[in-house]
Amino acid sequence: MIIAYLYCLAPAPAQEIAVLKYKGGGDWYANPTALPNLIRFCNENAGTTIDEKPETVEVGSSSIFQYPFLHMTGHGNVVFSDEEAENLRTYLYSGGFLHIDDNYGMAPYLKKALTKAFPDKELVELDREHPIFNQLFKFPDGLPKIHEHDGKRPQALGIFHENRLILLFTTESDLGDGWEDPSVHNDPEEVRKKALQMGANIIAYAFKN
């Protein structure tokens, strides 16, 4: 209740996002050029005015309540303490949004951590008709495949609270790699474009919902 009260008092910027720093040994800091590039793309193509240098906030910090959108990524282990799990849950139930992009290898650890934060909820796959795929840019086939890795199909998985999508987990897609500077992965321009457009859709959807 105290956290929720602080959330109401905090000067929350209308359009700001932050990187979520978590414990467990996973590289929460992966893809350092990804988010700034996505923000720049959104500011140029989606009418946003997001700070191009996103802040970093820890899962258990009250600072997360200052941001309507959090981004999380990595390859490895993810661990939430009881207090961190409660803080994240309160943030999301209070109107926040979390996008988690699997940088390949994160999924099994993340799902365990999410079970702790949301013991009564499950990740459910979004179908291709979900509005998140039809915001500024149209993705009739759903989440695009950016990097092949093991060739599995990309999935957009969500957690809902009171019919609102509060958490989006994108896996087997690697959107963040597509947002990075062109020199990092040497992706074709068309691949980077798809990744950035899907990212813009996610941000646009989160800001409106």
PLM region spans:
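Sec-exported extracytoplasmic/periplasmic mature domains
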Residues: 43-47, 90-93, 115-119, 207-208
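Acidic, glycine-rich loop-and-strand cores that form catalytic or ligand-binding grooves
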Residues: 112-143
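Extracytoplasmic/secreted envelope proteins and their assembly/folding machinery
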Residues: 32-39, 85, 89, 107, ...
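Short, surface-exposed beta-strand/loop micro-motifs that present aromatic residues
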Residues: 59-60, 151-167
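Short alpha-beta junction capping motif
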Residues: 17, 69-108
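Aromatic-Pro/Gly-enriched surface loop or interdomain linker
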Residues: 12-69, 73-76, 166, 172-175, ...
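Bacterial N-terminal signal peptides
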Residues: 1-8
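Surface-exposed patches in mature extracellular/periplasmic domains of secreted proteins
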Residues: 49-57, 100-103, 121-129
